């Protein structure tokens, strides 16, 4: 059984959105037993929800139809619930070409004081930036205004200036910045690195470094200018975990820094929605005859185990309703 929320943004299909589902159980039902259930975006699996504390699942998603369905699927381990559901339009070029479903794992404002987060109105996309300090790194910051008038190709990401005013670097100037995270399973990762030179260097000095990830599956060299943002988006990187190193080049007179970072995995979209003409027709029938069957939520045919009661579907590309 599934319960679905239908989002109808004005911009319609083939548009990039941030979608965030927030959950806070709080023992609202008095059972003191956190339910476990699945979350679907349109006709594809998004995540499994199981947490007694406040948390959220967030994706960057390119809409496949005029409507977007977010469904809570009962898997027999308690009644699904949701505390908030948000949708924000993004620049269509913010995701690497061809990637329609990115699932956020971490988004960090590096060098910021702990117990601090930043979102709208500072971030026009309403991304939530969590403060992160690494004890083995030194903190750098500036009160100067970040130059956000860089070219459109860089600034489609619209990262807030406040996020870029802090950074961290290595304790030892000759050491790289190194981090690793362990994943639950084999994934394809995309990482967004954000940099700004926030230290006024002396004439002739330069901060240049090379980013490498997962045994050089991705590698890129970056040179910074004072107060001008640089965004580096990795190519897809495979692995059970993710490691990266940011190391100064031989001609750099300064150690590497990192201002902010986002980690995503590439989501799978194996299922194709039911033909839109069929969906419109069956929803018109549903409205005309005031049909209130419990199963008539979400996509009529897909996933096949949640096909609406009373319908027969064919499973070509796309699936079609052949009997109602």
Regions found by a protein language model. Give the residues of each.
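Compositionally biased, intrinsically disordered or flexible polar/acidic segments
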Residues: 1-314, 320-324
């Amino acid at each position: 059984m599934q319960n679905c929320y239908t989002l109808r943004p004005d911009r319609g299909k083939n548009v990039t959105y941030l979608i965030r589902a927030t959950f806070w159980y709080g023992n609202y039902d008095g059972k003191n037993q956190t339910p476990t259930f699945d979350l679907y975006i349109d006709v594809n699996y998004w995540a499994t929800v199981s947490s007694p504390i406040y948390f959220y699942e967030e994706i960057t998603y390119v809409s496949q139809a005029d409507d977007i369905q977010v469904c809570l699927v009962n898997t027999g381990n308690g009644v699904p619930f949701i505390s908030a559901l948000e949708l924000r339009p993004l620049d269509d070029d913010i995701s690497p070409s061809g990637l329609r479903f990115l699932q956020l794992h971490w988004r960090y404002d590096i060098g910021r004081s702990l117990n601090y987060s930043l979102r709208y109105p500072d971030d026009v996309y309403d991304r939530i930036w969590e403060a992160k300090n690494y004890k083995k790194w030194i903190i750098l910051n500036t009160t100067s205004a970040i130059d956000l008038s860089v070219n459109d190709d860089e600034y489609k990401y619209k990262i807030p200036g406040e996020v870029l005013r802090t950074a961290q670097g290595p304790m030892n100037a000759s050491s790289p910045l190194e981090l690793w995270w362990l994943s639950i399973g084999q994934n394809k990762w995309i990482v967004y690195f954000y940099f700004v030179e926030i230290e006024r260097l002396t004439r002739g000095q330069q901060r240049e470094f090379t980013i490498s990830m997962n045994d050089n599956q991705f590698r890129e060299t970056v040179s910074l200018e004072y107060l001008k943002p640089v965004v580096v988006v990795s190519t897809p990187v495979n692995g059970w975990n993710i490691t990266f190193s940011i190391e100064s080049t031989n001609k750099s007179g300064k150690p590497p820094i990192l201002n902010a970072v986002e980690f995503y995995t590439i989501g799978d979209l194996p299922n194709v929605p039911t033909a839109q003409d069929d969906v419109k027709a069956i929803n018109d029938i549903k409205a005309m005859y005031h049909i209130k069957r419990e199963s008539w939520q979400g996509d009529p045919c897909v996933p096949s185990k949640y096909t609406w009661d009373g319908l027969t579907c064919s499973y070509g590309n796309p699936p079609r309703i052949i009997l109602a």
